[in-house]
Structure formats: C-alpha cells, structure tokens
C-alpha cells in the first residue's frame, strides 16, 4: 500500500510539474508578446527616437525636423496607411496538427450583416460536414443565437464598451484570446467577416501559418480605404458574397486569391414557418392584409420619422390591415401602442416571411436579398448617403426585376402612391436561394 501511495504521489508530482512548466512557458510567451506590443507603441518609439538623439548630440540639431517626420510616420501606421516594421511582429507558432475545426469571427456592425453571414456559413458547414466543429469568436452581444444551434462561442466586448482602454490594449486582448482559442482547438480554418481587420487579430493569425485564413468581405478594397495597408496579405483567400449589383470600380491590387460566392442568406424556405403558424405566433388574423416593415432607423414616436410616416400612410390606405415592425435585438425596445401594429423582436425574422403579404424595407444587403429570395412585393427605401454601399442601385435592380418599387424621397404622399402601386406587383418566380450546387461547391472547397 505504501509503495502504491508513493507511486501515486510521484505520478501526481510529475503531472503537476508538467502542468506548471506548460503554464510557465505560456506566461513567458504572453510576456514576450506584451513586450513586443509595448515596443511597437507610439510612445515607446517616440521615446526611443528622442533617446537615440540624446546619445548622439549631433542628431539633436536635426531633431526639430526628424521628430515631426517620425511622428507623422507613426501616425500613418496608427490609421493603417503604413505597415508596421517586421521587427514589431512576433514569430510563427507553427502547428501542423490541425483538428477538423473552423473558427468564425463576425465583427459587430450597425446591424446583423456580418453576424448573419457567418451564422449562415456555420449552418452550411454543419449541413455539408456534420463532423466539423464550428466555433464563434465575436464582439456581438447576441451569444444566445449560436448557442441555440450548439455552436461554442467566445465573446470579447467591443472597445467602446470599456470605460478606459486604449486601442493597443484592446487589440492585445483580441490577440491573447484568439491565440488561446487556436492553441486549444487547433482549427484548420479561420474566417473573418468585417470591413476592418483588427491588428490584434492579424497578429494572432500570423502565428498560425498552417491554418487557412479567409476574409469574407462585400465589395472591393477601394483605394484610399481605411483598412491597414498590409492586412490583405495576412489572408489566403478573400471571399466576396454575391450582390444584385456589380461594381465597375477598380480596387487595390493584391496577390491574394479571390472567390466570388452566391449571396449569403440565412433562412431557407423549408425552415420558414407556414403562413398559418407565422400569423398565429404574431397574433394577426389569418385573413388580414399584413405588411412587414423594417427600416432599421428612426424613432417610431417621432411623427416626422420615416417609420412613423410609413405607419400612418399604411393605416390611412387601409385601416383594417396589420403592420409587423421588425425590431433589432441590438437596439432599445420600441414602445408604441396601436391595435393594428405588432412589434417583432426576434432573430431571424425571415422565418415569419410566409405570413406577410407586402413589405417595406431599407436597401441594405441583407434586407434586399431576403426580400428578393422570398419574393414578397416590396417598397424599398434606399439610404442615399452610404458611400460604400450603393443601396439605390441595388434597389433599382429589384424594381427592374419586378420585385417592388423604390421610393427615393419619403414623403407621406409618395409613400401612399407606392403602397397603392405595389399591390399590383406579382414578382416573377426565380430561384435566388442558397441551397444550390454553387453553395455546396464553395463550402466544400473551403473545407
């Protein structure tokens, strides 16, 4: 018994020693990365420049010129217009033993665009490769959504949720958390969906040379855009989801592989509720005329807002119809009392589409393609002030295809005219869905 106990103690001590050694190595690596981040900071490098001048007094004569110039170069790095020096980047963490695992990183935007595309990709991967583990890492607060589908999810709060944290510190948090995820799960692929790649994320994926790195991004990389100039080269493939409009603009030239994939839609027709079930859940009569309104901005209680003008115009047109207003999970709850109005705060709202007769939508990518796929006669309100997203051109395509009408100037009179006109529209039957050989092909090619 005594020898057995001593053997167990020895074995336990060896395990403790191994665990302690592993922890010490990881702490040393973290300290090394923190030192690199500090040495790469603006304050450190400006101080280094001053110190170098002090060590060689003749350089002090030129300091009034070199210091502003050096500050200017560091400023360009800070806003992404100049790549940081290679010495500021940390060495590779090669690991060829990859697991059947994919990490998806949807950033947080104004709405659900980035998240919805990654959520759709996650579900598509599961359909085509059920054994592949899909893991989310995101600053989006809606963590319950992937949990419902049993997708493990890591969360980091957005920078502006913290009271006192610098961009360097926040990027350090991203880098450390991603490296922990990569070490734990050993993913074979990483996919980012966002307009701006964070430096902490770039530093982390750079340390995983055997991991495939994808960037899903709508539109071209425009010359003069604010993305870090060296960021594209951190990825193996750029994925451009399809759109109703094509751009003729030439973007930034780069050598990274580009793939064009079908429009990314989350909900398939067979996943939608029937008309009867949708209306039952929404609490509207089966025989009623039902309009779905989702504009994404404006206060419903402001009588001059577009959404209030729209509600008033609809009820003036037909006081017996019902209106379902799509409310974002990211915003404050809407408070509006009208027996003909229902507030829908759910995700994804597309499961209710069979319960709607007509729709009034903003001209964003997701809204447009959802209406295009479901073929609900729609009045589009394009945002005319989005520099990177030509919503007007997209909505005009829908008008030309017979899907609906575009209202450029939203007055009550114009809205009323559009309401009357859209009721005579019967969208042509066409397949804009994602359940196609094209989807199977591009998802399979990634895996």
PLM-predicted stretches and their roles:
Residues 96-106, 124, 128-177:
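Conserved nucleotide-sugar phosphate-binding/catalytic loop shared by glycosyltransferases and other
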Residues 1-86:
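Boundary detector for helix-to-coil junctions that initiate low-complexity/charged tails
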Residues 418-424, 432-447:
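C-terminal alpha-helical cap of glycosyltransferases
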Residues 346-392:
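A donor-sugar binding/catalytic signature common to diverse glycosyltransferases
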Residues 69, 73, 77-89, 217-219, ...:
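A nucleotide-sugar donor-handling region in carbohydrate enzymes
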Residues 275-358:
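Donor-nucleotide binding loops and adjacent catalytic segments primarily
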Residues 178-197:
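Short N-terminal targeting/anchoring amphipathic segment
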Residues 106-119, 300-302:
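A short, glycine/small-residue-rich beta-strand->loop->alpha-helix junction that serves as a flexible
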């Amino acid at each position: 018994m005594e020898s057995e106990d001593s053997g167990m103690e020895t074995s336990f001590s060896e395990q403790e020693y191994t665990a302690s050694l592993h922890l010490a190595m990881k702490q040393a690596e973290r300290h090394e990365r923190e030192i690199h981040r500090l040495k790469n900071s603006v304050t450190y490098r400006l101080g280094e420049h001053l110190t170098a001048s002090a060590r060689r007094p003749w350089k002090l004569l030129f300091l009034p010129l070199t210091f502003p110039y050096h500050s200017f170069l560091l400023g360009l790095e800070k806003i992404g217009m100049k790549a940081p020096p290679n010495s500021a980047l940390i060495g590779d963490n090669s690991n060829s033993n990859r697991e059947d695992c994919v990490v998806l990183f949807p950033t947080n935007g104004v709405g659900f665009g980035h998240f919805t595309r990654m959520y759709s990709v996650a579900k598509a991967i599961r359909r085509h490769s059920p054994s592949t583990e899909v893991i989310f890492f995101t600053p989006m607060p809606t963590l319950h959504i992937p949990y419902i589908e049993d997708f493990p999810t890591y969360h980091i709060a957005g920078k502006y949720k913290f009271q006192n944290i610098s961009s360097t510190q926040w990027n350090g948090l991203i880098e450390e958390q991603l490296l922990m995820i990569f070490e734990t799960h050993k993913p074979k692929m990483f996919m980012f969906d966002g307009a701006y790649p964070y430096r902490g994320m770039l530093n982390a994926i750079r340390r995983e040379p055997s991991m495939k790195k994808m960037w899903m991004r709508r539109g071209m990389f425009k010359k003069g855009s604010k993305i870090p100039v060296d960021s594209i080269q951190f990825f193996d493939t750029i994925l451009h989801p399809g759109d109703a409009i094509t751009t003729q603009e030439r973007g930034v030239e780069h050598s990274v592989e580009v793939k064009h994939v079908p429009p990314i839609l989350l909900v398939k027709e067979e996943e939608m509720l029937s008309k009867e079930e949708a209306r039952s859940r929404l609490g509207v009569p089966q025989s009623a005329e039902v309009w779905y309104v989702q504009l994404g901005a404006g206060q419903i209680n402001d009588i001059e807002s577009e959404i209030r003008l729209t509600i008033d115009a609809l009820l003036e047109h037909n006081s017996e119809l019902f209106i379902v207003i799509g409310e974002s999970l990211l915003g404050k709850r809407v408070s509006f009392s009208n027996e003909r109005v229902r507030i829908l705060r759910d995700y994804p709202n597309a499961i209710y589409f069979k319960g709607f007769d007509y729709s009034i939508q903003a001209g964003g990518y997701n809204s447009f393609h959802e209406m295009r796929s479901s073929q609900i006669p729609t009045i589009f309100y394009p945002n005319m002030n989005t520099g990177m997203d030509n919503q007007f051109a997209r909505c005009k395509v829908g008008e030309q295809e017979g899907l609906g009408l575009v209202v450029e100037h939203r007055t009550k009179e114009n809205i009323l005219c559009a309401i009357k006109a859209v009721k005579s529209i019967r969208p042509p039957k066409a397949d804009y869905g994602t359940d196609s050989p094209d989807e199977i092909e591009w998802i399979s090619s990634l895996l």
